[in-house]
A protein has these predicted regions:
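ABC transporter nucleotide-binding domains
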Residues: 3, 10-156
Length: 156
């Protein structure tokens, strides 16, 4: 699987934030966008994730425009998107089910990721009792539990 951005342009009103951005990322490999604040990293990611469209250029997956109705996406934004009063297992299963997994598949996938990240002891704990670092791991599981084709992990 190959993700390509070709000559992406994006403006917000009169402010041009991306001009001719192009890159390729191969499936199964880590890929990072590095740059100073305001360089367009988050804007590029949000275009890939279909949060908003580019003004020009194209986003391709294996040489074809992405069909966002058929592709699985996992997104871990910089901002936290957790429900602090919910139990870890309930929250993770809920988000996995929103991505189309059955309740049984969701719990199985969540348990796999909790184990893989050394988080099984927090399975039945409320999120607001976890450290910020462990909350970030829980949010990571929300992005990965449904085995997405593309996973976007935005870190500060």
């Amino acid at each position: 699987m190959i993700l390509e951005l070709n000559n992406i342009d994006k403006s917000f009103g009169e402010k041009e934030v991306l001009k001719g951005v192009s890159f390729t990322a191969e499936g199964g490999k880590a890929f990072g966008l590095l740059g100073r604040n305001g360089a367009g990293k988050t804007t590029s990611i949000r275009i890939i994730m279909n949060v908003f469209p580019a003004n020009g250029g194209e986003v391709l997956l294996d040489g074809k425009p992405i069909d966002y109705h058929k592709i699985g996406l996992g997104y871990l934004p910089e901002e936290r998107g957790l429900y602090p009063k919910k139990l870890v297992i309930d929250q993770l299963a809920y988000f996995a089910e929103l991505k189309g997994m059955s309740a049984k598949e969701a719990v199985r996938a969540v348990d796999y990721w909790l184990n893989r990240l050394g988080m099984t002891e927090y399975r039945n704990k409320r999120l607001d009792t976890l450290s910020k670092g462990n909350q970030q791991k829980i949010q990571l599981i929300t992005a990965l539990a449904h085995d997405p084709h593309i996973a976007d992990i935005s870190l500060e």
